[in-house]
Amino acid sequence: IDREPQPTPKNVQRMQYLLDHDIYDLPNELRPTCQQGAHSYKSMYGRLKWEEPAQTITSGFGSIGQGRYMHPDRTRALTAHEAARIQGFPDYFDFSPCPTRSALATMIGNAVPPQLGAAVITAFLELSARSDETLRVDESQSA
């Protein structure tokens, strides 16, 4: 889970350029030819910022070509552990059922952040309890 993804030599050059120039978005001319020109997704090949929230984690977090998944100050993409932390998984969470790095990336990238899931469930239960109480009051008034 803490193993660093192995970037291509070209992606190492791209990441080094971002660090050397202290920028977060790769200039258009340094992108692969197929991604140059008018594009709306400038965070591809982007670098995370310590002082800003991370973008949505997807199963592609191991490659900087999939989004803004470059470590803020290292020449590498996020590790699975770092991506899991961004998603809100506690460090003690057991990812051992994932037999491959790809399965691990899919599990982390497709997950609903645990804190968000807990908030949604709590809100649903509170709303459900209020609805039940309203139904009981309505039934007692109609009797």
Where are these regions (language model features)?
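C-terminal target-recognition/interaction regions appended to catalytic cores
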Residues: I1-A143
